[in-house]
């Protein structure tokens, strides 16, 4: 595109003036000297990484994970921390609920000796700690568990029964304005865990909403709705949950996709089970009757035994994982089906009804 010579001269002058006043890089052409690829961190689930479209959660952005109680919200964030630590990244956990179990975190692969943890007294304190860690540029991933537990100072100092209308929403709105720019500059991923509440008097549509006002919905680049869809049983004993995650908002790739995986108690996401299922779906693993084979070699009779084989032979599991990522993320092929066809979507917030 050719620009008029006078306009080009005026543009050059104003750009020089802006850079002189605010520093180099304060304004630039979008395609100039910058990577268009978004750096991501794996969620610990291959199918969710694929559903997100970019291979994981984006650094430098705000992410919201919400769902009912015991749906796997904290487990998913601990899996993200474990994946980030394996890449040598520094992580922090702001435990506003005062409920983090370090033994469980360790079982999921989290290096608790190098995990920063804070249990703030008030919501303002939690968000100030977030801001300080972000501005330091030394922390790569920050988890806040949860928005519902970020209690304003005025509410803590007041009495039970006092009215504090909109205090938490105002606090979150101010924090979002302050944090968004700092997160981008320091390339820090900030994940908020949120709880679900019911709107009173809703006759039509979805009565569910999240706590903390609307600011987080708008500032979040990715919003994940996590639900437990069933139980995994070993004979009579329940050993885990069937889990479904919907990507209800996504600013880095196509939204409204969903992923299904298993969360095993005391172990976390069942990665080998995912590899077997996706491997069969995309013809990397052959299934003949109950037997599973990889490159002509039998790896197990039944899904559980095939998964056990991949646990015992991690190099083969890693090979299948890399092949699936190259196929599904490199080629842009999505494993998860779009949810837009059979569900209503709130275009303002990206929520699926």
Curated annotation (Swiss-Prot):
InterPro entries: AAA+_ATPase, DNA_recomb/repair_RecA, DNA_recomb/repair_RecA_CS, P-loop_NTPase, RecA-like_C, RecA-like_N, RecA_ATP-bd, RecA_C_sf. GO terms for biological process: DNA recombination; DNA repair; SOS response. SUPFAM superfamilies: P-loop containing nucleoside triphosphate hydrolases (SSF52540), RecA protein, C-terminal domain (SSF54752). GO terms for molecular function: ATP binding; ATP hydrolysis activity; ATP-dependent DNA damage sensor activity; damaged DNA binding; single-stranded DNA binding. The keyword Ribosomal protein does not apply. It holds the Pfam family RecA_C. It comes from the Bacteria. It is found in: Cytoplasm. ATP binds at residues 67-74. Can catalyze the hydrolysis of ATP in the presence of single-stranded DNA, the ATP-dependent uptake of single-stranded DNA by duplex DNA, and the ATP-dependent hybridization of homologous single-stranded DNAs. It interacts with LexA causing its activation and leading to its autocatalytic cleavage. This is Protein RecA. The lineage of its organism: Bacteria, Pseudomonadati, Pseudomonadota, Gammaproteobacteria, Alteromonadales. The gene is recA.
